[in-house]
């Protein structure tokens, strides 16, 4: 394993441990309305949780905390655990299928570890019914970190470490042979589909900084979209295909995406290329790792943090 890759793995591991062991943090599940600019707190807790998905019917969110997955009503209320069987080391890479029937997630498949003391290289992707159940394995190779469903629900995108490099892969949602979509040196991560399935948006270090890129669904014709002093992560196209929301660290982080940092959520207009800052907060890892738009595309969900 080369030195650069080892350093990246260590940074990811340390970031995870720092947050997982931080009891003095308040997590807030919020929504942001892109028309009014209003932030609304849906749920908050004096513990650490991450990565909201907004259900296709608009009635609930899925978050992760302490290795487990939870459902939170969209109108607020008490979180309820989603049964995942033996998969109890779930991380913040999870998402609901377009038809609302399945939940995909990544789980550290380490029988000797716990969520606070896990083996990074054991992450696999699984699915369960949206109501919970016995997990079905999707990826046999490790590590694999889920990121998106295709619009038709037939394919998944994920980031995987193969041949000492993190790249973006696609695989049938029911499992099968994985297809490598990127092969540039450095980290490629945070992939998500445009609603019509034509493009995949992702973040990449291939330019020397973490920027947002897009490519054809087959991995061809990569094109850089952002070029600024920030570290830009996790582009998520809106349901109407007009925008994508993404996270920007206000200070360059190299290829790391640590937690509890000053960040901005920004909106990229796909017609004009204009970028609008929506709001600033304390966050990063766990804020908007996975797709979180409302079904009507007027709002998206995120997690903001406050240390006490």
Identify the residue ranges that each predicted region occupies:
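Hydrophobic beta-strand positions that form the internal "hydrophobic ladder"
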Residues: 60-61, 103, 153-156, 197-200, ...
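Residue-level detector of Asp-centered blade-edge/turn motifs that repeat once per structural unit
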Residues: 56-57, 98-99, 151-152, 195-196, ...
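A flexible loop/linker signature enriched in serine peptidases of the S9 family
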Residues: 21-26, 43-49, 61-70, 84-91, ...
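Short loop/turn segments that connect beta-strands within beta-propeller blades
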Residues: 34-37, 73-77, 129-133, 172-176, ...
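Positively charged n-region of N-terminal signal peptides that target proteins for export
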Residues: 1-4
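A short beta-strand motif characteristic of beta-propeller blades
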Residues: 38-43, 78-84, 134-139, 177-182, ...
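Bacterial N-terminal signal peptides
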Residues: 7-16
């Amino acid at each position: 394993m080369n030195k650069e890759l080892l350093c990246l793995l260590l940074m990811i591991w340390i970031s995870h441990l720092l947050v997982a062991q931080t009891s003095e943090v308040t997590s807030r599940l919020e929504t942001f309305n892109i028309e009014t600019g209003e932030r609304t707190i849906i749920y908050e807790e004096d513990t650490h949780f991450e990565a909201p998905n907004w259900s296709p019917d608009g009635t609930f969110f899925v978050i992760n905390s302490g290795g487990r997955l939870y459902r939170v009503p969209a109108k607020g209320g008490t979180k309820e655990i989603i049964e995942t069987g033996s998969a109890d080391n779930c991380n913040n890479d999870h998402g609901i299928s377009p038809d609302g029937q399945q939940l995909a997630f990544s789980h550290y498949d380490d029988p000797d570890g716990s969520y606070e003391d896990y083996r990074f290289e054991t992450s696999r992707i699984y699915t369960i019914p949206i109501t919970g159940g016995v997990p079905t394995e999707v990826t046999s190779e490790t590590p694999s970190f889920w990121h998106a469903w295709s619009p038709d629900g037939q394919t998944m995108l994920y980031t995987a470490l193969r041949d000492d490099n993190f790249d973006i892969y696609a695989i049938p949602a029911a499992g099968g042979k994985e297809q490598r979509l990127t092969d540039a040196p450095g980290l490629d991560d945070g992939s998500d589909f445009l609603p019509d399935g034509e493009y995949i948006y992702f973040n990449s270090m291939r330019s020397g900084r973490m920027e947002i890129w897009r490519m054809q669904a087959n991995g061809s014709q990569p094109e850089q979209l952002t070029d600024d002093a920030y570290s830009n992560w996790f582009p998520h196209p809106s349901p109407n295909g007009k925008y994508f929301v993404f996270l920007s660290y206000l200070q360059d982080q190299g290829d790391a995406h640590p937690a509890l940092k000053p960040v901005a959520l920004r909106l990229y207009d796909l017609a004009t290329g204009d970028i609008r800052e929506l709001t600033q907060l304390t966050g990063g890892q766990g804020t908007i790792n996975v797709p979180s738009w409302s079904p009507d595309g007027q709002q998206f969900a995120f997690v903001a943090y406050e240390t006490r």
